[in-house]
Amino acid sequence: CNASQQRAIQAAFGNQISIIQGPPGTGKTQTILNIVANLVVQEKTVLVVSNNNSAIENVVEKLEKQGLGFLTALLGSLERKTAFVETQAIEKAIPAEIDSWYSAETDSPEFLRTIQSEAEALQTIFERQERLARARQELSGLQTEQLHFEQETTIDPTITLRRQMPSARLLMLWNELQAAVEWQPNGLFDRWREAVRWFLLKRRIRRLFDGFSRHPERQDLQRLIPLLQRSYYQVRQEELSAEIDRIEKQLATSDAPAMVARLSDDSMRYLRSRLAARYGKGHKRPIFQHITPELLKEYPVVLSTTFSSRSNFRAETLFDYVIMDEASQVSSETGA
């Protein structure tokens, strides 16, 4: 699990419709598996569809590797439905060791609180990692900008700032001066309002700058803007460097891979214990001679191609969730 996968899962459960997208290798299939696992814990039904068989077979294979293949029904074409009916007794048999999956510890509220605490701690780590990446990227961009700025801009050496300011205030003042230079009043009210603003701005300039005229004209502000730009670049880089150093020290005390492994282990223990309570203790799984809605009580995860999914059950059969893998490859007719 990573930050983007975690956000995708939260979005999937927080919205009626959610889109998960990304290039190959970014964990979209793993995200589908995590969503399916959460639905199984909640005893919900889910239909997983795709425009091709290989995509849904990939999902089934990954669930089987986790020992969860007995929850799935791979349907679709007449051939696949026939194969399911004929092989379900063997290929979809409930694991013989399922009773050993049960753990009384997972029934306690404390165990769920532990999982929640682990998830929140991991979320904090992910947020720090992302903020660190953004800060490094911003710092690199500012360094490049400053290099070009210093090569192309002349700064009046006789003008200085009286005191240090945070970058946010420098940027605000920079924009304010730039707007004052470019502002063109239109009408009597605008001219009156601008006269008041100009009076107040000149008072601020006298407090903030040394070596600058105490009675400047509007065009004189152009001499101040390069100084503010340079100060902004310097101060913002100092702020980012300090933030990067702070986050790196925070992350150095955390073992993210170990935290992910611990959360995954505890989550799987909880899932398996719930499955043991549902399918263990001598549970007799019926053998289905036909594909009917009752099948969903035993096989809450149904997989099919998009084109064939409508033919699996009666039209009135409802699933709690539908996951469409590789949705961009599905035509609007079959997707509907």
Protein language model annotation of sequence segments:
Residues 9-17, 38-41:
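Phosphate-binding P-loop
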Residues 15-35:
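Walker A/P-loop
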Residues 1, 171-318:
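Conserved helicase NTPase catalytic core signature
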Residues 22, 77, 326:
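The Walker A (P-loop) glycine that initiates the GxxxxGKT/S ATP-binding motif of P-loop NTPases
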Residues 1-11, 84-105, 272-278, 290:
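Pre-P-loop entry segment of helicase/translocase ATPase cores
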Residues 45, 53-144:
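P-loop NTPase motor core
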Residues 317-331:
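SF2 helicase catalytic motif II
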Residues 311-314, 330-336:
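Short, conserved "post-DEAD/DEAH" coupling segment immediately C-terminal to helicase motif II
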